[in-house]
Every structure is written in structure tokens, then in C-alpha cells.
């Protein structure tokens, strides 16, 4: 009877743990969906902002705004984390030894190094990707740019294979549906690789590496701090060509304050931070699929804000993409022990 009760309790705890894990995955997926919405609407801000400032200036200023906003919120988040940690420690009756303290101190130094490296690498990739995208849009249509950029949903699983990640068959099916959906959604003319197309294709590869790098570093470091370092790095890198080629002035920047604030506060500070935090508890392939919905949301934002209407073909593309997202959420079957 005692063994039976212990078995029941253990099974109950396992069920609770699995439920919490599934709940975290669902929350992460919803965060990534919100990220896609924010980024989709940001295309409107980018379009309007480019009427006043150059692409490098826009990217530099928006990233510095994102850095500043996160710096304001980091102390508040630290306070919340300390309160949570204090609650956990209060419920733990085990004493902390000197060895544990020394180990924690050593680990803290290592974590800071990993945080800085991760933030800088992510910032470099973000600067390259966003710059290629912003400049590429000048030489190609928005439809082509949206389709080619979203090709990272195909590139990510391929890159994952090289680092030993297994990709489920259902994920590949979802990728295929997403590619077809993106084609119907974004393409308004025959596909041909011109100067702008090549630049945006490079952007797609850079975003793919960015997703993989975030997937590597995010479980090891504080996501908000890494995001802050990422934006600061990106702002500096984009600022160099801005000063050399665009001669930005304060009047032009202030004139574009509305799109810059949206892109800096929501698209950068909120969007990329949600991406980093959410990717701790979800698969990078599913993450890339969810974030690829920014193309759908950008068309919806153009329809509502700029009064650009969706054609039946584009609506079919939206439906296919949502079908792919739903399909990718089907859980993997687990073998049950006898």
C-alpha cells in the first residue's frame, strides 16, 4: 500500500511537471505570436520613417531607443526576480554552504562573460540583417522583400541539422505550407533576383543565424540584458555607415519621432526581448514559423492603417500560414513505459 501511494504521488508530480512545461511552451508561443504582430506593424513605421531619414540612421536610432528603454526596466525586473528568489529560498530549509557560495560566484563571472559575448554576437548579426533588409527594400518591391526575408523559416531547420538538432517530419510539412503561404501572400509579380533581392536574401540568412545564436545563448543568460547589449551593439554598428553616407541631422530625426519611437520601443525593446525570452522554452523551428507571421500582420496593418486591401490570393496565403502554425503545434508522441 505504501509503495502504491508513493507511486501515485510520483505520477501526480510528473503530471504537474509536464503540465507546467506545456504551459510554458504555450506562453512562449503566444509571446512569439505577439512579437510577429509587433514586427508586422513595424513595417508601416519603417515605411513612414524612411521618408525622413536614411536606412542606417533609422536602424541606429531605433536600436539606441530600444537600449535606453531596456536600461530603464532592468532595475524593476531585477527587483521582481529578487523577490521571487527570496520566496523560493524562504521555502528551502537546506543551509547554503561556503562551497555553494564560491561556486555561485565563479558561475556569475562565467555568466557575465557569456552574456557579453552573446549580446555582441546577436547585435552584429542583427545589424547586418536589418541593414541589408532596409537597403534592399530600396531596390526591390515590398512583396518580394517580405517573401525573401521570411525564407529564414526554411533556412533555420537546415542550419539546425548542422548543429545536431533533429527536425520532425511535421515541422518540414509546416515549413512547406508556410513557404507556399508566404508566396501567395507576398508575391505580386514573377520572382527574379535583382540587386535588392540579393541583399534581402543575405538578410534572410543573417536572421537565420541570429535565431540559432539566440537559441544557443538564451537559456544560459538573462534575456533582457542580452537584448540590451544586442541593441547597443547594433546601434553603434549601424551608426558608422549612417555618419559616413547619410549625414543625419537632429531635425530629420525629430520629424520622424513617431515611427522611430514605435520601432525603438515596441519593435526593438519589446519584440526582440520577447523573442529572446520566449525561445528559452520553444523549438527554434517553431519559433521561426511563428515569427514569420510578421508578413501576414504587415499586410493586415497596411490594410487597416494604410487602407491597402487584401486580394483573395493573399487571404489564401494567410490561411495557409495559420494552418502551418497550427500544424506545428501538434505535440510529439512519446513512448509510454510498460
Task: Name each model-derived stretch.
Residues 56, 67-70, 155-157, 192-246, ...:
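Transmembrane alpha-helical segments that form core, pore/gating elements
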Residues 4, 9-61, 123-124, 128, ...:
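Glycine-/small-residue-enriched transmembrane alpha-helix faces in small-molecule transporters
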Residues 63, 71-72, 76-79, 256, ...:
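C-terminal-most transmembrane helix of multi-pass membrane proteins
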Residues 70, 167-187, 207, 238, ...:
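Hydrophobic transmembrane alpha-helices of multi-pass small-molecule transport proteins
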Residues 59-61, 145-151, 214-235, 268-304:
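Helix-helix packing/entry segments at the starts of transmembrane helices
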Residues 40, 44, 71, 123, ...:
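Hydrophobic/small/kink-forming positions within alpha-helical transmembrane segments
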Residues 24-29, 52-56, 60, 111-115, ...:
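Juxtamembrane helix-entry segments on the extracytoplasmic side of multipass membrane proteins
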Residues 42-43, 77-89, 96-149, 184, ...:
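Specific transmembrane alpha-helical segments of multi-pass solute transporters/efflux pumps
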Amino acid at each position: 500500500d505504501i509503495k502504491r501511494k508513493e507511486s501515485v504521488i510520483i505520477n501526480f508530480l510528473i503530471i504537474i511537471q509536464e503540465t507546467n512545461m506545456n504551459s510554458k511552451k504555450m506562453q512562449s508561443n503566444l509571446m512569439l505570436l505577439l512579437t510577429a504582430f509587433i514586427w508586422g506593424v513595424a513595417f508601416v513605421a519603417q515605411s513612414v520613417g524612411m521618408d525622413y531619414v536614411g536606412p542606417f540612421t533609422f536602424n541606429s536610432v531605433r536600436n539606441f531607443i530600444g537600449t535606453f528603454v531596456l536600461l530603464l526596466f532592468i532595475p524593476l525586473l531585477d527587483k521582481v526576480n529578487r523577490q521571487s528568489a527570496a520566496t523560493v529560498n524562504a521555502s528551502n530549509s537546506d543551509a547554503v554552504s561556503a562551497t555553494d557560495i564560491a561556486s555561485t560566484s565563479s558561475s556569475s563571472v562565467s555568466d557575465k562573460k557569456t552574456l557579453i559575448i552573446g549580446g555582441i554576437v546577436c547585435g552584429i548579426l542583427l545589424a547586418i540583417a536589418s541593414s541589408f533588409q532596409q537597403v534592399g527594400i530600396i531596390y526591390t518591391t515590398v512583396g518580394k522583400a517580405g517573401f525573401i526575408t521570411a525564407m529564414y523559416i526554411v533556412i533555420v531547420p537546415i542550419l539546425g541539422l548542422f548543429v545536431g538538432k533533429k527536425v520532425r517530419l511535421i515541422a518540414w510539412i509546416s515549413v512547406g505550407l508556410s513557404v507556399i503561404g508566404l508566396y501567395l501572400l507576398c508575391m505580386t509579380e514573377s520572382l527574379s533576383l535583382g540587386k535588392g533581392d540579393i541583399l534581402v536574401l543575405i538578410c534572410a540568412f543573417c536572421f537565420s543565424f541570429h535565431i540559432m545564436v539566440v537559441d544557443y545563448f538564451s537559456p544560459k543568460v538573462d534575456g533582457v540584458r542580452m537584448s540590451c547589449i544586442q541593441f547597443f551593439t547594433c546601434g553603434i554598428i549601424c551608426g558608422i555607415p549612417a555618419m559616413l553616407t547619410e549625414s543625419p541631422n537632429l531635425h530629420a530625426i525629430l520629424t520622424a519621432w513617431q515611427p522611430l519611437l514605435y520601432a525603438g520601443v515596441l519593435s526593438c525593446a519589446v519584440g526582440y526581448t520577447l523573442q529572446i525570452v520566449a525561445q528559452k522554452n520553444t523549438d527554434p523551428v517553431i519559433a521561426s514559423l511563428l515569427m514569420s507571421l510578421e508578413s501576414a500582420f504587415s499586410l493586415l496593418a497596411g490594410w487597416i492603417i494604410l487602407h491597402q486591401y487584401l486580394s483573395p490570393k493573399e487571404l489564401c496565403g494567410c490561411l495557409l500560414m495559420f494552418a502551418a502554425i497550427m500544424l506545428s503545434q501538434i505535440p510529439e508522441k512519446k513512448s509510454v513505459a510498460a
